[in-house]
């Protein structure tokens, strides 16, 4: 057997070293170029945002405060009232999906509240598994049919019931093996915009205002705030105030936004930004942009921290502009990647394939560099205390400081820069959608009565008895309201 000569080995090593050198040098050049451009555009948008029209900042992911959402809705209603610009409510829909009969009562409760109590004019769309109405696969078809009749009777025209095929993960025996069926919401293309809701939740007010987010936004949702610590919050405040040199008082943003909405001006660049420290791997945006795409980045990403961003989009409430193109990509490209992976479900696909926060920055910046005036952002972050609160947070004191200020990196301060005291009851009073999540506690319909799972303070273990009693009372009131609502499902 002929051995490779030393000369040939040296030649191969030389070639490999040359390739490596070219790669590293080119990466450093790109890194330097990106850094220079990013510095320029950060300064550009800070100094010129007041006068910009149809030019959007690609270097940020924006959060929209609840006050601004309400201002947009009020402005749209005023156009209808004063200018006769009629809202086509048939182009909007609330959407639920049901693959488990135990959840169907919840849809009846939510749809009935939306129509009868909150008086929405939007369509109410239920995507329900065909299997639930098949006697060969379902043991309670009669009960399911009676609930469906009640749902349809809410309004014969406004309620739309669609029979669907489940998207099932093969060889997955977990309770979430059909959760990918949720992705069918992206295919409801007869509507311009839909509000998707998980129905294991309590709805406390209309969400109609979410239909009137800026038209260019294709996806908006709250974030998984429960992964954050108080240390993360403090870092985000420090980043906003010191590194970005922006005010952290949320009112300084909402006041400007209110005026701009009143004048019909662009608002995107004036929205508070999501602090980079919460979702990027380093303090250097250029570094993260490069590492977002380079297949060799694990080998050559010397400067990047290995810290993984804690924040993701929650998928229990989503505002979506459905499109055939997006759904085709989900079916043909994204689903095959995840179907056979263990412990990967709807939220994983949405955050890893569709709306990965880190990759969003990369895609925005690259597109902006190519055709600046054609770039439009597609995502917004919704305030989670109003649209994505978990019941578990009501009993978790570590979450209180987070839900008091649900635009991350910012606080509601008075004119002297002091925190405006916000109590737990006040914070929850603004919550419109509260998701049942108290693991290891089961969902409330699995218990014969409230007594089986009600919150009771153990005085001997209480660190702050008054606060814990307040939290328990609040938690119990949420569940008691739901238990009472279930009476509508009796047949």
From Swiss-Prot:
Glycans are attached at residues 136, 177, 187, 425. Coiled coil: none annotated. It comes from the Eukaryota. GO terms for cellular component: Golgi medial cisterna; Golgi membrane; vacuolar membrane. A motif (DXD) lies at residues 198-200. Residues 32-491 are lumenal. It is found in: Golgi apparatus membrane; Vacuole membrane. GO terms for molecular function: acetylglucosaminyltransferase activity; glycosyltransferase activity. Its main location: Golgi. Its EC number is 2.4.1.-. The keyword Cytoplasm does not apply. The chain crosses the membrane at residues 11-31. Belongs to the GNT1 family. N-acetylglucosaminyltransferase involved in the Golgi-specific modification of N-linked glycans. This is Glucose N-acetyltransferase 1. It comes from Saccharomyces cerevisiae (strain ATCC 204508 / S288c).
């Amino acid at each position: 057997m002929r051995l490779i000569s030393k000369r040939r080995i040296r030649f191969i090593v030389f070639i490999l070293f040359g390739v490596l050198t070219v790669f590293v040098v080119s990466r450093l050049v790109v890194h330097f170029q990106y850094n220079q451009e990013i510095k320029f555009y950060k300064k550009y948008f800070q100094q010129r945002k007041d006068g910009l029209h149809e030019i959007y900042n690609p270097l940020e992911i924006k959060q929209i405060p609840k006050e601004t959402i309400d201002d947009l809705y009020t402005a749209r209603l005023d156009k209808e009232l004063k200018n006769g610009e009629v809202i086509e409510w048939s182009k909007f829909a609330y959407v639920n999906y049901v693959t488990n009969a135990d959840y169907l009562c919840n849809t009846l409760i939510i749809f009935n509240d939306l129509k009868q109590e909150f008086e929405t004019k939007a369509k109410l769309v239920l995507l329900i598994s065909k299997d639930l109405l098949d006697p060969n696969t379902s043991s309670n078809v009669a009960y399911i049919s009676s609930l469906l009749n009640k749902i349809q009777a809410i309004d014969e025209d406004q309620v739309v019931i669609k029979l669907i095929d489940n998207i099932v993960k093969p060889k997955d025996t977990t309770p979430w093996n059909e959760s990918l069926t949720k992705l069918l919401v992206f295919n409801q293309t007869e509507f311009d915009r839909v509000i998707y809701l998980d129905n294991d939740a309590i709805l406390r007010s209309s969400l109609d205002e979410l239909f009137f987010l800026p038209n260019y936004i294709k996806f908006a949702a709250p974030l998984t705030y429960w992964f954050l610590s108080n240390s993360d919050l403090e870092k985000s405040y420090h980043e906003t105030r010191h590194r970005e040199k922006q005010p952290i008082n949320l009112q300084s943003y909402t006041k400007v936004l209110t005026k701009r909405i009143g004048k019909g001006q662009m608002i995107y660049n004036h929205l508070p930004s999501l602090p980079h420290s919460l979702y990027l791997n380093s303090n250097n945006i250029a570094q993260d942009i490069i590492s977002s795409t380079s297949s060799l980045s694990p080998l050559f990403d010397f400067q990047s921290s290995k810290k993984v961003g804690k924040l993701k989009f929650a998928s229990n409430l989503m505002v979506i502009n459905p499109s055939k193109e997006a759904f085709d990509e989900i079916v043909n490209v994204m689903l095959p990647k995840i179907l056979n992976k263990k412990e990967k479900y709807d939220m994983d696909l949405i955050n890893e394939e569709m709306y990965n926060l880190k990759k969003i920055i990369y895609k925005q910046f690259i597109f902006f560099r190519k055709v600046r005036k054609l770039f439009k952002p597609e995502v917004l972050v919704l305030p989670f205390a109003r649209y994505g609160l978990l019941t578990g947070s009501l009993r978790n004191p570590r979450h209180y400081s987070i839900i008091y200020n649900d635009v991350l990196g910012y606080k509601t301060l008075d004119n002297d820069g002091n925190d405006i005291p916000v109590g737990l009851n006040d914070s929850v009073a603004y919550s419109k959608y509260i998701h049942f999540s108290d693991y290891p506690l089961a969902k409330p319909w699995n218990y014969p009565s409230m007594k089986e799972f009600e919150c009771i303070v153990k005085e001997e273990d209480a660190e702050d008895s008054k606060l814990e009693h307040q939290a328990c009372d609040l938690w119990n009131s949420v569940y008691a309201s739901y238990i009472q609502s279930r009476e509508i499902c009796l047949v």
